[in-house]
Amino acid sequence: MRTSAPPAGDHALVQIVDAALADATRRSGPWLVCRPECAQCCMGVFSISQLDAVRLQQGLDDLQRHDSQRAAALRKRALEAVTRLSPAFPGDPKTGILADDDHAEQLFADFANDEPCPVLDPATGTCDLYSARPITCRAFGPPVRSEDGLGVCELCFHGATDEQIAACEMEVDPDEIESKLLKEMQDAGGPSGRTIVAFAVAD
């Protein structure tokens, strides 16, 4: 099920996350080596929310309006990815929704770790839907805390101490706006469950 547009609050969420990224980037200084064409974080499948999926779909619609050739190439990459990934997809390959049981989560941990994101343009090494990218992508690079502790990109913070890394921590969504927007979408009859980028932009 495709929703026409993200809820109104998504724009504010993106602004908050992007501001947090800018602040963490400033504090990180030269330890943060992210740059255009550094696409290591674009390799390997990761889960996204339905809010991310709708934002990507809107971004693809916008791309279609001003560069239909790039949009068609992106859709082709996504369809090819769905074809490759569907046989072992730990969820429903018809809907693209990931299963949320423990066994499926274990399977997903080792699923398609070498698969390039279909939104990544292989010719330029840059994201074709950068302004519409998922929250995970917006928070990659600076230190971000999860249940496993404080994680950083393996290419960044070489030589930094634990204290220096902690001082650059990025708080992604402290007010849990994303969770509220997802509930709003579900209450309005939108899909629930997590998916992956390829399924989000293949239709």
Task: Locate each region found by the language model.
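Short loop/turn segments that flank or connect secondary-structure elements
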Residues: 1-203
